[in-house]
Amino acid sequence: MPNMAETKDPVRLRLLSLELLKQLWAGHEAMCRSVVRAASGSNLDCSSNNLEMPLSQETSSASSVAPSSQDKRHMLDPLDSRRDDTFDVAWYVKFNSRMDSFLPATGQHQEPQEELRPPSVPLLATQGLKGPVSLGGPKGLGPDKTQVPRSILSRLSKPSKPRVTSQESAVPESSWHSRPYLGYDWIAGSLDNSSPVTSEPEAFFSMLQRFRENNKEDCVCNSPEAVFPGLQESSGVEEDHECMYCYRINRRLFPEPVDPGAPCRLCGIPRDEKGPGTLVEPVQVRVSIPLSIMDPPHQYRIHRRKSFDASDTLALPRHCLLGWDILPPKSEKTSVPKSLDLWSSVSYGAGQRRDLSATSPPCQALPAQVTPPLWSEPQVAQLCPSH
């Protein structure tokens, strides 16, 4: 009989612990639903007295199981206590997994859950979210199995770090005049592009519009002939008018008409209908000289190691290159040939040898035969006379 009682008491204790865990789970679900309802209401105002709950509910809930566990402490087997601990830990892991799956749905209402807690929610259920929960038995049964679940509410409550972006703040146009100009902005700012008409108020433009509406016939014209009648009638031209035609200097320095068929700008008479000008009645022309005509067509490099002397030439390019091209005259007694012809150079050398043979003694004079080059015509051999 004692053995039967010892085996029934652990089973009864296990059943009581399961019932207690079911009650805790039901309270946790009720707490989560109440937190969601409290967060959805915007006009929830709880006093500071309701935020601090007494610990009487926690002690009363824990005392319901304590006497039975203390009475049967000496009857528990170490193996049974280990099996109970492993069962409690397995259930607690399942409990935490269900709790973590439910927390993301209520994570967006973190402030009401931490700060505003309705008075109907027990403190025992909320303690599992903020601190470690011990599901182990008394001190003599074995070590406490504690686990600290990582709550998503602590991560969401952290303030976000400021980020640096490349988008500049919009600067109003009224403050542009106070900013310094750089580069092309300075050039554009120095130009007078502002019109005095744009600075007029709106009343000025409204008055101008009313004036144009009242005097529509004078302000609006459909035919250009009525605006400039003098361009169509040549009779209105003054008697002292002189026609002017435009010419341009070409590369040969001759004037040529810019537009041969263009009439006079004032009277409209073409150039072909005008007679030749005389000394009494000259014809006025306008001649334009392109800048490219004034510049030389070639660029001459001036030698930097020679001197310049402009006394022997009048040409501008040769005048600039005198120190480079002109050399002092060479003497005629030099032995350098005047041409690059090979036959003339050979004949010139033979004449020099003939002069030398005339001054030398007769015994040393030998007949000299000059062989013409292969590419020249055959010539008769020249023999030096012997004395």
From Swiss-Prot:
It holds the Pfam family MIIP. The modification Phosphoserine is found at S307. GO terms for biological process: negative regulation of cell migration; negative regulation of G2/M transition of mitotic cell cycle. Residues 50-59 have a biased composition (Polar residues). Keywords: Phosphoprotein. InterPro entries: MIIP. Residues 70-80 have a biased composition (Basic and acidic residues). The keyword Phosphoprotein applies. Residues 60-69 have a biased composition (Low complexity). Residues 50-80, 133-172 are annotated as: Disordered. Inhibits glioma cells invasion and down-regulates adhesion- and motility-associated genes such as NFKB2 and ICAM1. Exhibits opposing effects to IGFBP2 on cell invasion. Interacts with IGFBP2. This is Migration and invasion-inhibitory protein. It comes from Mus musculus.
